[in-house]
Structures are given as C-alpha cells and as structure tokens.
Amino acid sequence: MLSYPESLETFKHLRTVIVDEWHELLGSKRGIQTELALARISRIAPTVRRWGLSATIGNIDHAKYSLVGQSASAPCSIIRSDQQRLIDIELVIPQAIDRFPWAGHIGLVMLKEVIAKIESANSTLVFTNTRNQTELWYQAILRARPDWAGQIAIHHGSLAPELRTWVEQAIVDGKLIAVVCTSSLDLGVDFAPVDQVIQVGSPKGTARLIQRAGRSGHSPGRSSKLVFVPAHAFEIIELEAARQAISQKQIEQRRAIDAPLDCLVQHAVTMALAKPYAKQEFLEEVRSTYAYRNLADEHCDWVLDFVTTGGCLHAYKDFHRVALDFGKYAVIDQAVSRRHRMSIGTITSDMMLQVQYLKGGKIGFVEESFAAKLKEGDKFLLGGKLLEMVWIREGTVWVRKTKGDPTAVPRWLGGNMPLSSELALGVRRWIDAIARKEPLPDSLQALCGLMDLQRLWSHIPRLDEVLVERLTNREGDALMLYGFEGRSVSEGLGALLAYRISKERKNTISIAVNDYGLMLYAPDSIGIDTKSLVHWLSQRELQADILSSLNATELTRRRFRDIARIAGLIHSGTPGQSKSMRHLQASTSMVFDALKQYDPANLLLWQASDEVLSDQLQIHRLKETLTRMEESRWVHVDLKQWTPFSFPLMVERIRDRIGNESLAQRIRKIQNQLEQGTASESGSLTKSKRNAEKGNMQSRDTNP
C-alpha cells in the first residue's frame, strides 16, 4: 500500500498502529521491513502511536526501541500485565526408556499415549516440529482410530489457504477433537475451545513452548495445559530445562539484524514509487528506525546509486529502476513499477509447486526439489491424504487419491531447529546435577538406567568439563566431542575440527552432529589426544578457518539468492508465469559471478558473507562455546562399545546411507547387541563401577 501515491492521503489521519506478536518479527527481515514501513507512516502521519504486543520475549527493552524508532518525540512506556498465566506441564514418560536412544522415530512409539490424551479432552492441538512429522502423525492417529475420520484434521504452512482457513474455523466452532499441526498455529488465531496442547518432541526453545501452551485455555482466568511427549529419552532433560526456565521467567532474547542493505534497496524503490524524494529526506527517514540508526553516509550513497545505475550491472536496463531528476529520486518506468510491487516482501523460500486433483480442488504445495524426484505413479502424503502423482505440467503437480502405502514423503527445508542457547545451558545444568548425583525430579529419575550406564562405560560431564569419547573398531575410528550447545554450534565445531586436522594430516574425515555433540569418523586412525584438540579448537584465525571449512563461496552464493530476491535483482515471475527454481538459480549465479568479478566490494556480497557467519553458522555462539571449552577441564575416555551419549551420533552418521526401514532394523539390531553386552556385565553395578574406574580412568586426559 505504501508504494502507491494514494497512500499519502489514505494514512494521513491514521492514529494508531498495533503490531501483534512483535517478537516473531523482531530479529528477522520482516521486522526490518516493518520498521521501515512504520517510519514511512510516521512521516505521513506524525502523531501516529505505535503499540507492540508480546507475551514471549526476553529482551523487552530492545524490543521497545526497535518498535518506536529513534525519533519518537513522546515518551515510550512498557506495560506489563499483573496477571500470571499458569501453565500446567505434564510429561508422558515412556514405559520403557531406551538406554541407547536415537532421534529417528519421531516419537511414534508413544502413539497409544497420545491417543489416550486426545480421548481425555474435548479439543486438542497436537504440535510437531516439522511438516513432514505432521503428515506422519496424522496418518498414524487415523490408522489407529479410523472412527475419528472427519473429527481430526491437519494444518501446516504448505496446505492450500482455503483448507487452513476451514480447519481454523472448525476449531473455533468446536467441530474437531484434534488437529495435528506445526508452527502454523503458533500465532494469529485464538482458540477458546482448545482444552490442551500436546507437544511431540522438544520445542528447542522456552518461548516456543510457552507460545504453544498458550493455545489452550485461551480465556481470562483459565490456565494452559501442555502435555509433552518426548521423541527420545534425552528430550526429557530438555523439557525439565524448559520447565525450570519458565518458572524463572528466562525467555530467549531475539537478536536484531543490523542495517541489512537488501531491505534498504527494496525500500528505496518502494518510496520512489509513492513520491519522488531527495537524498536527505530518505536518509532522515531511514535513520529514524532503530535498525538503521547508524547508517553511514557512504552506505546510503551506495544504495541510491545502486537503484539508479545498477553498479557494475549498469549495461542492463532492468537494473536502472530509479531515475534521478533534479535532485529527486523517482520511478518513471511502468514495467519497473509492476515488477517491483509484485516482488515487495522479505519472505523467501524454495520454489513451490501447487498440488491439485485432476478433478477437484487444490490441496497444497510441495517444494520443487521434491517434485523433481517424483515419477508417474509415486504415492506421497499431503494434507493427510495419500496421493498418486499423475503428471507435472505448468508448475502444478496433478494427482488423484489412492490407497496403499506412500513411496515418498515430502520434505521441506527448515526441518532441523537448533537448541536455543538458554535451553542448552539448562540442559548442561541438569547433566551436571546428574553427574553430581544431586536430588532429581521424578522425570529425570526415569533416566537413571541410561545415565548409570553412561557413567559406567564412560563419564557424565560436569558444568566445568568437556567430555571426549573415542571408539576404534573394524569399521574405523570415531571421535565424539560433547558441547551440548545445539546443532548449529555442533556443525561449526565439527567443520572447524575436520578442516584444521586435514591441514596437518592426510585423512578422510566425515562429520555427524546433533544438539549435544559431534562425531568425527575416519576409516583410518584419527590419532588425536586432548592436547591436540585444545590446540585445534583455539580461536586463532577462527573466522577465516570456519569459512574455509564450509565451502564459504557456495554458502555465500546460496545466501545471496535470498538477498538478490529481496533487493530486486532477480524476479520469480508474474502470476501464472512463475520461473522455475533452476532458472532462478541460474540467474542468481550469473549476477553473483558478475559482482564477484567486476565489483568484489559490492555491499550485497559483503552482506551475504556476514549473514552466513551470523545466521547460518551462529559464530557468536561458536565463540562463546570455544571460550567456555578453553576454561574447562577435558575428560577423554577410550570406549569399548557405543555409549548412550555416542549412540545417537552413530545413528546420524549412517542415516543418509540407509533407507528409513533399513535404518530402523539396523538400529534395533545394534541396540540389541549393546543390551546383551549390558546384561552380561559381570558383577553388580557397584563392582562394575569400580572396574570401570580402574580401567577407564587410565585412559582419561585432562588439560595440560
């Protein structure tokens, strides 16, 4: 709306802007776009008031400043509710806990317990963490209770909007006893009829757990009820960490993005569409936002030059989007106007193909990368229905209903959510309590068998310790390092270690990671001691080495694809004539290579590299982890068999090489072998501990 000249009259008498769920925008480019839009509105209507609402944010002062901006003339207040919303959290503990857990079966072993909980309430939301899991859980529940057909539904972001709207209204009307969903129902709709929420698998963050719990009992004076169903044993620790954080009001902070130039390039064109402006007018308005409060003059000049000349792309007319006429910036080309208005926004995703019945309505969307692998006759799940692919034509996957078992399950990007830093600290504290044999809540008492075995065969690290395990067998040499900092940090640590080792020793090293640690695996001996690990995990030349270790050029190229879309350098096409992902990738690569060759100092290239470090690799958390490790005592244990800590990493290593069914069969076989080894341990647990200390402690190193 702000790109049209009529907006000046439309918003002139606006009095109030209310931004709901501000925490969901803060720290994302959608939030940056909101800040810029609010700055534009404040220019049009100087007396407008801004309100922000949030129930789950840790850094409330920062949220305030980013919302009201830098030029607020009136005082700004934070209003806190004095009503304490109670959250009743119930943990469903498995009847038998695997002492060798793995994160591959998405908790379906708890299906009976989930169905029993659904039966105990009038209306339930069953949250999973990914769209893929939502499809599988919906089918599993329906197979177990076919009489619930028509009474349960599915909801996620890749379903057709009309289907999602129908499900939301059916919840409000009390027509459904359960809905299996993802974060698509975290926000936006109030469901007073919902009695309880079931969370399958760890939410990976305290704020997300509170947000989802709040979907139940959504009326004044009512408490929220959340039932937590762990997908594997270690997630019980994550729940206790989250429960403790909630009781202590420790909610994750949202890290703000500082002055992204792709958003500013887009905004410069949007402003020029509505009304010609001078440079100083543009600079003052942009600097009134919190994100761009320190925008340098040279960066502003670069943005305005880029939208007028295209920089090194000046030979191409499409990049001359804004004209400078008598000191004013304006858009005079109608083709530019149409193309830009269709591209406004900061939400980017993989190219989606619509899924539609041959004779009937639309079902939803799958990513092009998944659709490209489908063959005629392939069966897949979407929207809780089993579909058979007939053909793909003109950007649409045409299907018919079918029966049997799926031969493919759609997978969408963004499936792995890393453990938040606050929750990771809580996990380490509980593991420390277990190591010190302190009194534990009942939920963690259920893990005693698993943890006793970890202590017997290896070690349980305390807060000031770093555990390293090593296992050599006929398949190769495996080294496990446990940081308990989340998947993103584990990926960074693993890549850094493998890169630095490979510079000094010739060896083929593969990496496996999870939220708790990493595994380096080599067919030949890795030959690493604690002193070498401490050396390789120093912060010396950290940024250069981490970029080199992860093929920084390719990572930057992928990140640049999103930046180029937001900045308007590539276009997804027009309605009915969308471009394929292959075409967009080729276009992005051409622009990227041209800038690298002819304009290596281009600020959008710099932004892409910076986002790879800060967002994808979370280098700030990586630095904090390395600092903590430098100050810790290192414990090195040579293993005779896989431990409860190392077993999930072993599963991650072989997962990509084996199909799901074959993987489950192989994992169960290895679990049985390890359980037999446990049962044959000679003597009592006390005697075994003495033997372990006598043998294992001889192979333990500490910091030199």
Tell me what each language-model feature is.
Residues 354-357, 400:
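Short, acidic/hydrophobic/Gly-rich beta-strand patch recurrent on exposed beta strands
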Residues 385-392:
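Short beta-strand-centered aromatic/proline hotspots
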Residues 2-274, 279-329:
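Helicase motor core with emphasis on the C-terminal RecA-like subdomain
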Residues 360-379:
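A conserved acidic, glycine/proline-rich C-terminal tail/linker
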Residues 347-349, 374, 381:
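Short, well-ordered loop/turn sites that connect or cap secondary structure elements
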Residues 187, 206-208, 216-236, 246-250, ...:
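Long C-terminal interaction/binding lobes of large macromolecular proteins
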Residues 283-352, 366-367, 410-411, 418-704:
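Extended, highly charged accessory segments
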Residues 393-410:
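Short, solvent-exposed secondary-structure boundary/capping segments
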